[in-house]
Amino acid sequence: FGYFCMSLIMTSSPLHMHLIKKFSLFETSIAIQLHVVGMFLPSLISGDLVKRFGSTKIIYVGVTIGFFSIFVNTMFDHYYTYVIGLISLGIMWNLLFISGSSLLVISYEEKDKFTAQGLNDFIVFSTQGIGALSAGFLLYYSNWTIINLICIPFLLMVIFVSFLSSNNKSI
């Protein structure tokens, strides 16, 4: 669900910033470029953080950063807050993707690894596609705040499933 939220907000943000808030294409592109840095730069340490603190704790940190991104995106209306919101969205995605991937490899038996990976990839990229393809439609028929708020129940589900899996090692 982290991929869905990231894709939904990331895809709608340049439309919102340029067409609705009238930021220049240059400003909008810089914001997206910094978001991409936020997505991938943490990879230098996120694997080590998962090893040191465990996947579940890093998932909780990622979700917290996601809530921070939603807060910044919905409560403030300045160029730099869009940049901060997008960078934190990228960091959220990174932490959820890395920690979720590390949980996946320990969650199935060896004989099921290809099926588990295939099913995971199908779910992850389907939700990502839904987020990306629905962004323009949702922005047109609602607004920036609603797009961000849509992600809250998905992040709450991530917390719930992570809590269940940390209390039941067979999940």
Where are these regions (language model features)?
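Conserved extracellular-gate-facing transmembrane-helix segments in secondary transporters
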Residues: 1-10
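Short amphipathic helix-loop junctions that connect adjacent transmembrane helices
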Residues: 11-31
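Helix-to-loop junctions at the C-terminal end of transmembrane segments
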Residues: 41-55, 139
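Structural signature of the two symmetry-related core transmembrane helices
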Residues: 57-71, 152
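Intracellular juxtamembrane helix-capping segments at the cytosolic ends
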Residues: 95-108
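A late C-terminal transmembrane helix in Major Facilitator Superfamily
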Residues: 112-141
